[in-house]
């Protein structure tokens, strides 16, 4: 399974679980890029079945509903959905 990388200023380990067709996921990626943040993302819907199942299980540890986008910051904080203010606050600290 391949994580895609968007280079920027390192604000910790940031991982975004997304769908390639999800408007809110696209908005989250755009916000992170506008903020100049270094992050990794996985478009779960583009994965092969076996990888998709692994990633969905991994994601559900953070977000049991399995909804998108799911943003994990430093393996400590989880933000579900496009929560612009919450994302900005978490990454400015």
How should these model regions be labeled?
Residues 1-4, 56-58:
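A generic local structural motif
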Residues 2-38:
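Local sequence-structure signature of Cys/Sec-based thiol-disulfide redox active-site neighborhoods
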Residues 22-25, 49, 80-81:
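Loop/helix-junction capping segments adjacent to catalytic residues or to phosphate/diphosphate-binding pockets
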Residues 26-29, 52-53, 84:
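Conserved strand-to-helix beginnings and helix N-cap segments that scaffold or border functional pockets
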Residues 30, 34, 57, 69:
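Surface-exposed charge patches
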Residues 44-65, 72, 92-93:
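Thioredoxin-like thiol-disulfide oxidoreductase module
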Residues 73-93:
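Non-catalytic, surface beta->alpha helical segment in thiol-disulfide oxidoreductase systems
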């Amino acid at each position: 399974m391949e994580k895609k990388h968007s280079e920027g200023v390192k604000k910790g380990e940031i991982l975004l679980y997304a769908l390639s067709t999800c408007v809110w996921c696209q908005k989250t990626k755009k916000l992170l890029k506008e903020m100049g943040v270094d992050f990794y993302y996985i478009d779960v819907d583009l994965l092969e079945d076996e990888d998709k199942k692994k990633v969905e299980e991994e994601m559900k540890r953070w977000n049991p509903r399995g909804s998108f986008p799911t943003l994990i910051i430093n393996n400590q904080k989880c933000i579900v959905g496009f929560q612009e203010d919450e994302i900005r606050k978490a990454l400015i600290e």
